[in-house]
UniProtKB/Swiss-Prot annotation:
Cysteines joined through disulfide linkages: none
Name of the gene this protein is made from: ATP1B4
Main localization category: nucleus
Descriptive protein name: Protein ATP1B4
Subunit composition and interactions: Associates with a SMAD7-transcriptional complex. Interacts with SNW1 and TOR1AIP1. Does not associate with known Na,K-ATPase alpha-subunits.
Source organism phylogeny: Eukaryota, Metazoa, Chordata, Craniata, Vertebrata
């Protein structure tokens, strides 16, 4: 609201009462003072209406902004509502009775088409796999050209292939003894005599006949390992600081050592002083895998096959220090120097015998 301003000027008086006529200078000064008061009053009257107009304009702008915000929010709500209605109609349109823009008949036709399509695809894949399996023998690998030379493994099991134990502390080596006893249960003499046959040494045990015919296996008795059999020394030498470690080749179907020469085992210090290992006894004494255990015909027909072993008896090894040992296979066609694979034709482990 615009305020009504009233002039506070004094009522006009006769000229004779306002100014003294006998003093001209005083008359002029009084006249000028009145003029200044009138000018200030007029300026004050002009400023107040301008401020009121600015306040009114600001109020009008605020009202317009509120109206715009209200209208924008209403438009947003209505847009979301329209979108929701469109989605609902797309999911289910009660007027056209369609779901996802398709009628029930259309959906039925699509399901039938896809059913027959995927059924045909599955039938073709099944037929291809069946035809492929007809060409593959379950008893003998079809392609053996890329089969690597045999790898090796050792027993007892040792974490990171580090054999660390103290001779005077049975708790440090007892688990090695338990591991060896468990591993050699299948090599017991009575079991081998019952399940397998006694084959002549030094020649391949070739068995003719159909590939699905059960094959016989040659005996490998636990007693062949002598001092490392656990029969004479139940602790396998660990109680005296002369440990036994067993080595065997992995099975490869159809593998035969080339030239009819048995594969031999040789162990030495990998790095360091060769005198750290002064004596090793091998069992069997030939330190080799006899030819009578080859070829291997696969687990389906060669059910009772027993892998041959070579035992290394470390009878004189330096004590109280880690000794890296490398055991290699030696023979024609044997690869034992693959840098990226420590178990192809060789095995590396550490002996640390404390007293």
């Amino acid at each position: 609201m615009r305020r009504q301003l009233r002039s506070r000027r004094a009522p006009a008086l006769p000229y004779g009462y306002r100014y003294r006529l006998d003093d001209q200078d005083e008359v002029n000064q009084n006249y000028l003072a009145d003029e200044e008061e009138e000018a200030e009053e007029e300026a004050r009257v002009m400023v107040v209406p301008d401020l009121e107009e600015e306040e009114e304009e600001e109020e009008e702008k605020e009202e317009e902004e509120k109206e715009e915000e209200d209208s924008h929010s209403q438009e947003t709500d209505s847009a979301w509502w329209r979108k929701l209605q469109i989605v609902n109609e797309y999911l289910w349109d009660p007027e056209k009775r369609t779901s996802l823009a398709r009628t029930g008949q259309s959906w039925s036709l699509i399901l039938v088409i896809y059913f027959f399509f995927y059924a045909s695809l599955a039938a073709v894949i099944t037929l291809c796999m069946y035809t492929l399996f007809l060409t593959i023998s379950p008893y003998m690998p079809t392609f053996t050209e890329r089969v690597k030379p045999p790898g090796v493994m050792i027993r007892p099991f040792a974490h990171s292939l580090n054999f660390n134990f103290n001779v005077s502390e049975p708790d440090t080596w007892q688990h090695y003894v338990i591991s060896l006893n468990g591993f050699l249960q299948g090599y017991n003499d009575s079991l081998q005599e019952e399940m397998n046959v006694d084959c002549p040494p030094g020649q391949y045990f070739i068995q003719d006949g159909d590939e699905d015919e059960d094959k016989k296996a040659c005996q490998f008795k636990r007693s062949f390992l002598k001092n490392c059999s656990g029969l004479e020394d139940p602790t396998f030498g660990y109680s005296t600081g002369q440990p036994c470690i067993l080595l065997k080749m992995n099975r490869i179907v159809g593998f035969r050592p080339e030239r009819g020469d048995p594969v031999k085992v040789s162990c030495k210090v990998q790095r360091g002083d060769e005198n750290d290992i002064r004596s090793i006894n091998y069992y069997p004494e030939s330190a080799s895998f006899d030819l009578r255990y080859y070829p291997y015909y696969g687990k389906l027909t060669h059910v009772n096959y027993t892998s041959p072993l070579v035992a290394m008896h470390f009878t004189d090894v330096v004590k109280n220090q880690a000794v890296p040992v490398q055991c290699q296979l030696k023979g024609k066609g044997i690869i034992n120097d693959v840098i990226n694979d420590r178990f192809v034709g060789r095995v590396i482990f550490t002996l640390n015998i404390e007293t």
